[in-house]
């Protein structure tokens, strides 16, 4: 799958490395929802996880956000959410 046109590194406003939270048993969904709600049109929120966060992607897509996830060269998954309206 090709990277969508809206995923531009210069538009990433926030990057959250969720690995420390997940290691503590904390699910970052609420934080992601709060951060994404504050995004301006075109801004991107990136979350880094050791697995594809499928339920989170589904919830954010259902809330009207554009979503895209890719496996990085570091073995981590980089998932992007944007309010592109």
Task: Label each region the model flagged.
Residues 6, 57, 69-71:
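Generic marker of residues within folded, mature protein domains
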Residues 64-85:
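C-terminal edge-of-domain segments
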Residues 1-38:
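An N-terminal amphipathic alpha-helical segment
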Residues 30-35, 39-66:
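Amphipathic, hydrophobic secondary-structure cores in small proteins
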Residues 13, 44, 74-76:
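A generic structural signal for beta-strand entry/edge sites
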């Amino acid at each position: 799958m090709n990277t969508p046109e809206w995923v531009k590194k210069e538009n990433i406003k926030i990057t959250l490395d969720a690995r420390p939270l997940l290691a503590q048993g904390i699910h970052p969904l609420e934080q992601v929802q709060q951060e994404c709600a504050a995004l301006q049109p075109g801004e991107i929120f990136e979350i880094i996880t050791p697995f594809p966060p499928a339920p989170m992607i589904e919830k954010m897509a259902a809330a009207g956000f554009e979503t895209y996830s890719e496996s990085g060269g570091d073995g981590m998954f980089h998932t992007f959410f944007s309010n592109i309206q």
